[in-house]
């Protein structure tokens, strides 16, 4: 599909001058779910300076692929906690690899909005680029004193697709034994409507097939021209049919879309069986910023598909393994934007849907809340998914288009929306928010930033047609893969190789996705505050002629971490 990119937003302003030097080596502090009453500052930790204390707690769904109940249960708030993870030796040295020219959101750069000529982006330029951003200089990233993993309060859906479902079909002249298989195909992906069965009757003669109200049946005919003899005589024995029950026990932690306001800590927990739901809010009332986190275990019905093996007198099922997606998120606004909630937003919804958005900061010069449009996009995406009960037939760009159509606030934003269907990750992207797929400790796939130039990303603005802007991805995933989805606040400050190393070591240590997201958010903030650390943003600035620029780029940071796991059924 030809993609068009049109200019929206403002021309980039020169990057800011280096700030006062901070220590090159600093301890990185994180939060873990150990219940605390407030925020404890750690001496010597740059991450807790000013109003950006990194205490994140909570668990809620990402994740990409939360299996929701039939009625889309609401969420229930739970307890908060804190995690302390220390960085033994932060990477502050000079790496020797080729510089990566990255596009970044101009949300923090001063300047007025200028008229920009349209720039065409060819499909080849919009393709995935697997080049890395460079190695980490200095001491390697080390994780020390990693906390013990707490029990995940997620839900796991136990699906029994291969169980024989049945009842005996009777008519006036015959009583037959029927073997039926329910394929858990409520969304119609396997060609059957909800409630449809595949039935077979074993007889001793010719077979004929007929389709009756969604039921495919094979009737045994014993040479009779007018009617069947009683089936007890023609079949010989009646196969007992057992009815299988798809049992779903789901626990979702805070699948609410982030509204961008992170001055309070929200923790939700809902246990859903059938159609029950409950909501309980806890306002912790902290006077300082607490990043918003979500933790979720999302199970997608991949194991509902089965292959059939037929013989003369039986039909058995071979069930594929079910994959689940455990996801967690953390968000930290720019220190100067804490009161307004920052300009980032994200959502994690049912059935493997999630996304991030980054409002363009230049709108604030016109008196417009730059984060409001981004939050409306994420809220609209979640609403579209929930109203369609997981949107099994909807594409990611369709969900985004529906959200963009319903947004009412002026503004523009970068945005990424993704969906995991149990086997394939589908994603659409506009701008320099992006994702990394990490497999076996290495970057397997990644999105490519869509920019007009340095620090000038492509954006979607109110009234734009997303179908003309999006870059689409489809990636097969397997057990053990990790997906890191984030705004440019992460990718401008943390090298991709370092992100992959954090993911690998954290998973080995048994950390939950939300704890990994907290670590990455805190690391991005640490580099962003530094005037001396080398960063992907400083590399890109030097590459386009901003000589002498060093340090990171302090910005809003939002991270969603998802891990593909096999269901323990």
Swiss-Prot record:
Reactions that this protein is recorded to catalyse: O-phospho-L-seryl-[protein] + H2O = L-seryl-[protein] + phosphate; O-phospho-L-threonyl-[protein] + H2O = L-threonyl-[protein] + phosphate
MF-aspect GO terms: metal ion binding; protein serine/threonine phosphatase activity
EC nos: 3.1.3.16
Entry keyword set: Hydrolase, Magnesium, Manganese, Metal-binding, Protein phosphatase
Keyword Metal-binding recorded: yes
Cofactor(s) for this UniProt protein: Mg(2+); Mn(2+)
Binding positions (Mn(2+) 1): 358-359
Biased composition (Basic and acidic residues): 179-188
InterPro entries, per the entry: PPM-type-like_dom_sf (IPR036457), PPM-type_phosphatase-like_dom (IPR001932), PPTC7 (IPR039123)
Residues in PPM-type phosphatase domain copies: 329-564
UniProt cross-references to SUPFAM superfamilies, sorted A to Z: PP2C-like (SSF81606)
KW Hydrolase (keyword) present: yes
Broad enzyme group: hydrolase
Co-factor remark: Binds 2 magnesium or manganese ions per subunit.
Residue numbers spanned by region Disordered: 120-214, 251-279
Binding site residues for Mn(2+) 2: 358, 488, 555
Pfam families: PP2C_2
Family: Belongs to the PP2C family.
Function: May play a role in responses to biotic and abiotic stresses.
Record's protein name: Probable protein phosphatase 2C BIPP2C1
Organism: Oryza sativa subsp. japonica (Rice)
